[in-house]
From Swiss-Prot:
Homodimer. InterPro entries: CofC, Nucleotide-diphossugar_trans. It is an enzyme of class 2 (transferase). It comes from Methanoculleus marisnigri (strain ATCC 35101 / DSM 1498 / JR1). It comes from the Archaea. Its EC number is 2.7.7.68. This is 2-phospho-L-lactate guanylyltransferase. The gene is cofC. Coiled coil: none annotated. Keywords: GTP-binding, Nucleotide-binding, Nucleotidyltransferase, Transferase. Pathway: Cofactor biosynthesis; coenzyme F420 biosynthesis.
Length: 215
């Protein structure tokens, strides 16, 4: 099955909730590293990719469309251009694998969806993308399930640790350090002085070498 992946990406000042531990230049580099992991998984699954960017950006392994409207409007514009099944996948889920994506696209349903933590949506696969409209932010998983019902779509909900792990907060970085072997995002964090640490209650978190943080 031929299908196309749509990856929203913010190349300028992304991931502001990581500002407590990464400056803007570092956050931009880290976001690019996570994007590389996602694109690698997409390509290995046999899919071509288009980046839906808020600012000018170039990538040798993906098409780029720059859209200045809000996220949902930009995604829905893109879905209207597709004449084949489509995958909407966020650029901040670096643990995703090609096998995970294949699991999504092999669904017998009209749509498969991976919920994110806190009610969000990390990935949607649509056999008929032009019939669907995206509604991200807030409890988007519930919104997307409602929209699928309105479209008359059958839906498979896929529960996956790797695909549901999006990176937004400092506490999320530990998942990359533990589970991200071979990923560009883990390499970036390690090269930036991050490592696994235990707090006084024995909970797992991350710490950063003060020397690296000062560079």
């Amino acid at each position: 099955m031929y299908f196309h992946a749509l990856i929203p990406f913010k190349p300028v000042n992304p991931k502001t909730r990581l500002s407590c531990i990464l400056n803007q230049e570092e956050r931009e580099a880290f976001a690019r590293a996570m994007l590389e992991d996602v694109i690698a998984a997409v390509q290995k699954s046999g899919c071509s990719a288009t980046l839906l960017c808020t600012h000018s950006f170039k990538h040798e392994n993906a098409l780029v469309a720059v859209r200045t409207e809000p996220l949902n409007d930009a995604i829905n514009w893109a879905l209207g251009q597709f004449h084949c099944p489509a995958l909407i996948i966020m650029g901040d889920i670096p643990l995703v694998t090609a096998g995970d994506i294949q699991r999504l696209i092999r669904t017998e349903k009209d749509m498969s969806i991976v919920p994110g933590r806190g009610g969000g949506t990390n990935i949607i696969f649509l056999k008929k993308p032009r019939c669907f409209r995206a509604d991200y932010y807030g409890a988007s998983f519930l919104d997307h399930m409602r929209i699928a019902e309105e479209c008359g779509f059958s839906v498979e909900v896929i529960d996956s640790f790797r695909m549901s792990t999006d990176i937004d907060e400092k506490e999320d970085l530990v998942e990359i350090l533990i589970h991200g072997k071979g990923r560009r995002s883990r390499e970036y964090l390690e090269n930036s002085g991050f490592s696994i640490a235990l707090d006084e209650k024995g909970r797992v978190g991350v710490q950063r070498d003060p020397h690296e943080e000062a560079l």
